[in-house]
Regions:
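Catalytic nucleophile loop of clan PA
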Residues: 63-99, 110
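Gly/Ser-enriched beta-turn/beta-hairpin loop segments
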Residues: 29-35, 47-56
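Short beta->alpha transition motifs characteristic of CBS
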Residues: 21, 38, 43, 96-107
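A structural micro-motif recognizing beta-strand termini
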Residues: 1-7, 61-67
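Short glycine/Trp-rich loop-beta-loop segment that forms part of the substrate-binding cleft
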Residues: 2-30
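PDZ/PDZ-like groove recognition
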Residues: 109-154
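Terminal peptide-recognition signature
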Residues: 14-19, 41, 61, 70-74, ...
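Short, Lys/Arg- and Gly-enriched loop/turn segments at beta-strand edges
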Residues: 24-36, 83-85
Length: 154
């Protein structure tokens, strides 16, 4: 999905998204089965987001993402038709929005007081996931260096 499609389709905060990823706490003996998580686009920032890697392009989604979900494709779902126990998705109304990058968490400390003060640090997932937009993936895949590398391999 390009910026033009996002504008044409009026993609905005509140639009439904979903992704499929692993749930590390659940695994089977014969095969690992992915879980599907649903949410909504929460913010499409107009500027880059500060990160340890430097400023990056991100989209924010209101959904739970945990370790094991990074790299999962995230889809934008226009107007799902729900039927008992199923979700029917219209063919051209499903678009790749990006790739799951991670999640945001709240840092905090807990003081325990009876006789001794013990300070425990914790990180709590706040329910906002970070998505690398598909436009960024397109830029990387079709960068001059990678195009030349693919051409020289042929």
């Amino acid at each position: 999905m390009t910026s033009e499609i996002m504008t044409t389709e009026k993609v905005a905060e509140g639009d439904e998204i979903f992704f499929v990823g692993l749930l590390p706490q659940y695994y089977n003996t014969r095969r690992n089965e992915p879980v599907t998580r649903f949410g909504r686009l929460a913010l499409s920032p107009k500027e880059k987001i500060a990160s340890p890697e430097g400023p990056i392009d991100l989209l924010f989604a209101e959904c739970q993402s945990f370790p094991g979900n990074s790299g999962s494709p995230v889809f934008l779902q226009f107007g799902p038709i729900r039927q008992a126990g199923t979700i029917v998705v219209g063919g051209d109304r499903l678009m790749l929005l990006g790739i799951m990058k991670g999640y945001f968490y709240q840092r905090g400390k807990v003081n325990i007081h009876p006789v001794t003060t013990l300070e425990l640090a914790f990180q709590e997932n706040i329910g906002i996931a970070a998505i690398t937009p598909v436009q960024k993936l397109h830029e990387i895949l079709f960068s001059e260096g990678l195009v030349q590398q693919r051409e020289s391999a042929n």
